[in-house]
Structures are given as structure tokens and as C-alpha cells.
Swiss-Prot record:
Keywords: Hydrolase, Plasmid
Molecular function per GO: allophanate hydrolase activity
Tagged with keyword Hydrolase: yes
Family: Belongs to the amidase family.
Pathway given in the UniProt record: Xenobiotic degradation; atrazine degradation
Effect ascribed to mutating residue 189 to A: Loss of activity
InterPro entries: AH_C, Allophanate_hydrolase, Amidase, Amidase_dom, AS_sf
Biological process, per Gene Ontology: atrazine catabolic process
pH dependence of this protein's activity: Optimum pH is 9.5.
Enzyme Commission number(s) of this protein: 3.5.1.54
Protein's name in the database: Allophanate hydrolase
């Protein structure tokens, strides 16, 4: 489930149930919310979830609070901590001091004494790594099922895969537990789960983030990645995480420009694979949503340039069918030789296939890749950015387990070449199928164009919302966007609470499919309650208001049960804070979902 209803015992104060992105955490802390209470409540909520395969291990609460206290002391001394009090998840192939690093394999587990380089940079900025997240074993997979720790599932429909290999990291963000997580992305392991859970997945240029403290999958290609709800959050985290590491031979020096946002010209060229080279494996709705994304980018001033996808596809095939699979064996060779029984059967077969490779195969692969990179140059001479589906389709867990190699390979159709060709990429939401499953696209740029493509991805996600009110194409700085659905709508009884707090109406839009709306019993004034229901048909009308950060915490703290603030997904795939209802309150409420909104229901009375 993507959206959490507020906990009944915690309504009335700002808790993790109200906090979904960096802005909401920062607004709450600025308004006086105690960060220790937020972290403690977060642990309580994880405990309530019970046996959830998101997490492999958790940092003890006492350790998290001690880390927070240290950050508070540094903050009180005037140190700038841009991520103060922000909890995050860490994929369990990245070291967190004191927690076992398993890489999804109990027989591999070891406990490091120090954080990975990137984790340490985030901790230095005040963030709190609360635990290690589930993954496809040794980051070998794009589906999330290759793990002995239970299978994380798509938050929109638990019958479907979450995507991988950064499965737990994606689900931890998508279900609202943490505002961001670290994943990794060698073949698409950060982008695929982002698409399947309606998130942003930022895959930086190789070497922009240090790999020190990362269990290698393919060391020459590995990238630590960021999963978040918004492009702004992904960039904010990336700017902290990025940095040259002299102890990592694959770390690269890059100027601040690599993560600097770019104002795109009114006219630009974007490349898409020629129609005959596109593949959706029978998923007609994914194909339609990609075509819609192309039209949207044209509305934004882009000129669509079709290109020959052949060299990119052939490069992608080298990742597992070529000598680069030997890098996976190099990372765990002694374990694979001495204790092959501890490996997941599918992962074992993939990694041990490297034993068939020779040194000659390796050099032939290097030569072949160089030829393909040269062949791709003619495409890059014509385009400013590439637009691809993040994944051609999505599969059920049952289907993936029945055909794990072929279906997993299908998922990487548009992702596997990116690191081999030294490119940057960011995956963003791009709408929903009629069954409520999300679809995503990826913007791909040259090396160190991370900030530029992120800017375009952000504009893409916000485009539909901007059309709702052309005068406000993006939220003003120092505001938090909040979706209202009932008594806070324009001309409704509680709208004054927004206007008196300095709120400004930005747009009228609709939620993504899969929300139910109920008229609450004995509510004064009359108001509805909305919650996520994957069986609900249609969408719900909402207004988006921009509320000053200074007033956000106070506004939230006055919301009475059974309502609270959680994450709401809009019809364009973007996320905002918005009103959600505790599930128990609908037991005596009237289902008014079929009206499509509160105003339509009132008009019918």
C-alpha cells in the first residue's frame, strides 16, 4: 500500500505518518516538532508492520537516538546539517557501521566497523540510517524475488514484483516509512523498482558517488543510487552523497556542475527508439503510456528524434551474456567456490556461468563495447537527451518465480546499457495503467549531466500540474504542496484555515486510480475521508495548495482524528502531501467514491 493512514493514537501531532519528503520533515522541525519523537514513532510504526520483508536489519533505536543527539549538538554549534533528523534506508550491500552487511546472503554476512563513504557523508549531514533493506542477492536481479529474507512486493498490488535489486529500498520509500533510501544501480537496480513503485530513481554518473563500503556486483560499473518521492529530494541527497574518494579507484572528480539544475531551452531534441525497435512484451498500456510521455515532452518544447536502438540493445546484452558477468564472480569467488550452496539458485547459475569466460572473451567484449559506443555517437550528435520506458512491462511474483531468467531479462531491455556506455539516468513516474499499476520513464544523458536531466525530469513530472494553473508552473520556494479533498476545498467551510496560513491555490487535479472516498458520519462540518484502496475504480478530485513551510507544522498539528496527512499520488504520477483517513472511520461512513469528488457528492444531495 502506497499511502499510510494516520495512526489513531498519534493523530493531532506531527509524526512520520505526516512526513513523506524532505520538505515536510524540515517544515515540521522548523515548527518545533521534536526529532527524537519522530524517530521513536517511526520505529514504533515499523514494529506495528510486523514481519515485513522490507528490512533485513534495523539500527537499534537507542543507537539512532544517540546519532540524532550528536547531530543536534553539532547543529546547536552552528554546523550546517541539510539532512538533520531525516531517517533513511540503506540497501544491504552498503555498509552501515555495527549492522551486518549480508548482500542478501546469510553465508556472506559480515559486520563493518565504519560506514560506507556515502553513508558517512549523509550521517555527517545529519541523516539517520535506520536500517538495511532487502535486495536481490548480490544485487543480481531486477525483480526483487531472489532473496532468502522474504519477497518485497509492489506497494500498489502485492501480487506484483517490487522490482530489484533495490527492492526493500524502494518499498521503504513508497510506503512512506522513510523519505529516501540508498540503492544501487548496475543494470537498472535503482530505476526498475522506482518505476514499479511510482518513485524517482536517480542513477548518477559512474564514479560520482564513491563505492567504498559497497559489496561489488560489477565493480567497474556499480553506482550507488537514490530512491525518493521527488526529483528535488533525489538531487538534495545526491549533492550530499557525491564526492571524490581517493581510496576508491573508480571514484571520479566532478565539478558542482554535474548536479546543478539546468534551465532547458524552449526548444530541444529528445531521442526515442524507432518504433520498430521498441519492445513492451505485449503490455499495450505501457506502450500507450510511453507514447503519452512522448507527446508530453513535445508539449514542453521538445522535438522527437527517432534513433536506431540497435547499438544500445547490443551493448545491454554484453552485461550478462558477455564477460562483465565475470565481475560478479570476482566479487565473491571464494564463497562461490567453497560454499556454492549458500547462493540463491538463480544467482548461483548466473555468477558461475562466468567460469566459461576466458581472457580472450574479456578483451573481445571490451573491443565490442568500444565499437558500440562509437556507433552510438551519431545518435548523441542529434539529441540533447534520451527518453526511454524505464521497464517495458511488469510481472506478477508468481510469473517471475516460474520463469526467473527470461522475465528478468525482459525487464532490463531499456536499462542494461547505461553504465556500460558511461551515461547518467533518472527514472520518474509517468502515469498509471487502468489496473492501478504505475508506469515510469527514464531520462538519459551523457556522463556528468545528472543535474540537467534531473531538471527535465522534474519539469516532466510537474507539467500536467502546471497546466492546471499556468501562472504557477512549480511550487514557490519555502512552501509545501498539500492536496485537499473536502472541507478545505475552495468555498468550503474550512478553506479559511489554508488562506489564513498563507496558502495559495495552485491547481485542481485528480488522484491516481485506486482511492476511495467516504462521507464521514457525524462530522462537523461535513467532511469526507479518503484512503487508498487498490480495488477502487476511478480517481478523486483534489485541489493542490502551496502552504508556507513556516505554517505547515502548526496546520498539521491541528488536524483532528480520524484525519491526518500522508502521501497522495496524483494522476500524473507525482506525489504530494494530502488528507488521508484512518481505516476504522469508514466502517460507519458512506462510500461516495463513484461521485469522483466531494463537490460532486454535495451537488447531488
Amino acid at each position: 500500500m502506497n499511502d499510510r493512514a494516520p495512526h489513531p493514537e498519534r493523530s493531532g501531532r506531527v509524526t512520520p505518518d505526516h512526513l513523506t519528503d524532505l520538505a515536510s520533515y524540515q517544515a515540521a522541525y522548523a515548527a518545533g516538532t521534536d526529532a527524537a519523537d519522530v524517530i521513536s514513532d517511526l520505529y514504533a510504526r515499523i514494529k506495528e508492520d510486523g514481519e515485513n520483508p522490507i528490512w533485513i536489519s534495523l539500527l537499534p533505536l537507542e543507537s539512532a537516538l544517540a546519532m540524532l543527539a550528536d547531530a543536534q549538538q553539532r547543529k546547536d554549534k552552528g554546523e550546517a546539517l541539510p539532512l538533520f533528523g531525516i531517517p533513511f534506508g540503506v540497501k544491504d550491500n552498503i555498509d552501515v557501521a555495527g549492522l551486518p552487511t549480508t548482500a542478501g546472503c546469510t553465508g556472506f554476512a559480515r559486520t563493518p566497523r565504519q560506514h560506507a563513504f556515502v553513508v558517512q557523508r549523509l550521517v555527517d549531514a545529519g541523516a539517520i540510517p535506520i536500517g538495511k533493506t532487502n535486495l536481490d542477492q548480490f544485487a543480481t536481479g531486477l525483480n526483487g524475488t531472489r532473496t532468502p529474507f522474504g519477497i518485497p512486493r509492489c506497494v500498489f498490488n502485492e501480487n506484483y514484483v517490487s522490482g530489484g535489486s533495490s527492492s526493500g529500498s524502494a518499498v521503504a520509500v513508497a510506503n512512506g516509512t522513510v523519505p529516501f533510501s540508498l540503492g544501487t544501480d548496475t543494470a537498472g537496480s535503482g530505476r526498475i523498482p522506482a518505476a514499479f513503485n511510482n518513485l524517482v530513481g536517480l542513477k548518477p554518473t559512474k564514479g560520482l558517488f564513491s563505492g567504498s563500503g559497497l559489496v561489488p556486483a560489477a565493480r567497474s560499473l556499480d553506482c550507488i543510487s537514490v530512491l525518493a518521492h521527488t526529483v528535488d529530494d533525489a538531487l538534495a541527497v545526491a549533492r550530499v552523497a557525491a564526492g571524490y574518494d581517493a581510496d576508491d579507484a573508480f571514484s571520479r572528480k566532478a565539478g558542482a556542475a554535474a548536479l546543478t539544475e539546468k534551465s532547458w531551452p524552449r526548444r530541444f531534441n529528445f531521442g526515442v527508439p524507432a518504433a520498430e525497435h521498441r519492445q513492451f512484451f505485449g503490455d499495450a498500456e505501457a506502450e500507450a503510456l510511453f507514447n503519452k510521455a512522448v507527446r508530453k515532452l513535445e508539449e514542453m518544447g521538445g522535438t522527437c528524434i527517432s534513433f536506431d536502438y540497435t547499438p544500445f540493445r547490443q551493448a545491454a546484452e554484453l552485461l550478462y551474456a558477455g564477460p562483465w558477468v565475470a565481475e560478479r564472480l570476482a566479487a565473491i569467488e571464494s564463497l562461490a567456490d567453497e560454499h556454492p550452496e549458500v547462493l540463491h539458485p538463480v544467482v548461483r547459475d548466473i555468477i558461475l556461468s562466468a567460469k566459461r569466460m576466458s581472457a580472450v572473451d574479456t578483451f573481445n567484449g571490451i573491443y565490442r563495447l568500444a565499437d558500440l559506443v562509437r556507433a552510438a555517437e551519431s545518435t548523441w550528435e542529434k539529441i540533447d537527451v534520451m527518453l526511454l520506458p524505464t521497464a517495458p512491462t511488469i510481472y506478477t511474483v508468481e510469473d517471475m518465480l516460474a520463469d526467473p531468467v527470461r522475465l528478468n531479462s525482459n525487464l532490463g531491455f531499456y536499462t542494461n546499457f547505461v553504465n556500460l556506455m558511461d551515461l547518467s539516468a533518472i527514472a520518474v513516474p509517468a502515469g498509471f495503467r487502468t489496473n492501478g499499476l504505475p508506469f515510469g520513464v527514464t531520462f538519459i544523458g551523457r556522463a556528468f549531466e545528472d543535474g540537467a536531466i534531473a531538471s527535465l525530469g522534474k519539469a516532466f513530472v510537474e507539467h500536467d500540474l502546471a497546466k492546471g494553473n499556468a501562472a504557477t508552473a512549480a511550487p514557490p520556494k519555502d512552501t509545501v504542496a498539500i492536496a485537499v479533498v473536502g472541507a478545505h476545498l475552495s468555498d468550503q467551510p474550512l478553506n479559511h484555515q489554508l488562506t489564513e496560513s498563507g496558502g495559495k491555490l495552485r491547481a485542481t487535479t485528480r488522484t491516481a486510480p485506486g482511492y476511495a472516498l467516504y462521507a464521514l458520519r457525524d462530522a462537523t462540518p461535513a467532511k469526507p475521508g479518503m484512503l487508498r484502496d487498490q480495488n477502487a475504480v476511478g480517481s478523486i478530485e483534489v485541489e493542490i495548495w502551496d502552504l508556507p513551510v513556516a505554517g505547515f507544522g502548526a496546520f498539521v498539528s491541528e488536524i483532528p482524528a480520524p484525519l491526518g496527512i500522508g502521501t497522495i499520488t496524483l494522476e500524473d504520477g507525482s506525489h504530494v502531501k494530502g488528507f488521508l483517513c484512518e481505516p476504522h472511520a469508514i466502517e460507519t461512513a458512506l462510500d461516495i467514491t463513484h461521485y469522483g469528488g466531494w463537490r460532486a457528492y454535495l451537488a447531488a444531495q
